[in-house]
Amino acid sequence: RFKKIRRLGALPGLTSKRPRSGSDLKNQLRSGKRSQYRIRLEEKQKLRFHYGLTERQLLKYVHIAGKAKGSTGQILLQLLEMRLDNILFRLGMASTIPGARQLVNHRHILVNGRIVDIPSYRCKPRDIITTKNKQRSKALIQNFIASSPQQEELPNHLTIDPFQYKGLVNQIIDSKWIGLKIN
C-alpha cells in the first residue's frame, strides 16, 4: 500500500497517509523524462488503486462512459463516484474505500430499506443510505464518524444525518467535488 502511495502520490481512498515530500524529489531526479505511455499508465493506476477496482471493472466503466453522451473522462469519474463504497467513504461512514467495501460486504448497509451487499452498487439520486438496525452495525458506523476528521467538507451531492446514521444522495456528483487529481 505504501509503495503505491510513494509511486503515485496521495490516494485518499486507499489510506489517509500521505507520501513524504522528500521521496517525491528523489523520484523526479531518478526518473528522467516521462513518456506519454507512462503518464497514462500512472493515471490509470491512480484510478484503480483509489477506487479499489480490478482491471476488468475499470475497462467496463470506461466502455460504459464511452457509450454515454458527453466527456468520457467526466462521465467515468461520475460513474466511479456514484458507487456505494465510494459514497460511504465520502459520507465519512468509513475511513477508506476498502473499509467501506467491508461494511457493505458484511451486510451492515441498507439502501432504500433493503440490504445491499455489493460494493459496486450504483447509487442514484434520492437514494437513502442507512445502517442496519443492529447495535453492532450502528457501533461500527459511530466509531468511523467519531474518528473521521470533521474539517473535510461534505460534497454538495450528499447529505448526512450522523445521529440517525443516515445519508442521502441528492444528485449526481459535480466534477469539482471529485477529490482525486487526474491528468
UniProtKB/Swiss-Prot annotation:
Q: Which biological process annotations from GO are given for this protein?
A: ribosomal small subunit biogenesis; translation
What Gene Ontology cellular-component terms does the record carry? chloroplast; small ribosomal subunit
Alphabetical list of Gene3D superfamilies matching this protein: Ribosomal Protein S4 Delta 41, Chain A, domain 1, RNA-binding S4 domain
* PROSITE patterns hit by this protein: RIBOSOMAL_S4, S4
Citing just one GO molecular function, the answer is: structural constituent of ribosome
Major localization class: plastid
Q: Which family does it belong to?
A: Belongs to the universal ribosomal protein uS4 family.
> Its quaternary structure?
Part of the 30S ribosomal subunit. Contacts protein S5. The interaction surface between S4 and S5 is involved in control of translational fidelity.
The task this protein performs is described as:
One of the primary rRNA binding proteins, it binds directly to 16S rRNA where it nucleates assembly of the body of the 30S subunit.
What is the protein name given in its UniProt record?
Small ribosomal subunit protein uS4c
